[in-house]
Amino acid sequence: MLLGDHVFVGPHATLLGCTVEAACYVATGATILQGAILGTGAVVAVGALVHANTVVPSEYFVPPNTIAVGDPLRVYSPGNEQLPDAIRSASFARTAFGVRTAWEDRVTRYRDGAEVRAQEFGSHLEDDILDAGPER
């Protein structure tokens, strides 16, 4: 993940493997997924989702509780009938997990993604904790 200068990230926002250029505002509860790019001065409002591999242009405002997908960018409301096809085009499973399972085979795709994540976490099983933080 890359964060530019003067970026504000609100409480409970999630940023995963994305690029956030300078002077962006990521509001409370917003989510920015892997491979997404927020251009300089972009705003992602409360509860909005910027999907994988999406490019949000500089100074663009992603409205609250919407889903931004693609390059060029399109913004969808949660109930939009075109949203599933837009999400499929974002290639989230491939970008986030390296999984290339067919979109229609949802169970296998989710299982494959969970296996990848479990292996990533498992690779840290023997890590040494350098600082456990304050005593509780």
Model-based region annotation:
Residues 8:
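Short HxH-centered metal-ligating active-site micro-motif
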Residues 11-12, 19-21, 25-135:
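Glycine-rich hexapeptide-repeat left-handed beta-helix
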Residues 1-2:
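Surface-exposed loop/turn motifs in large extracellular/passenger domains
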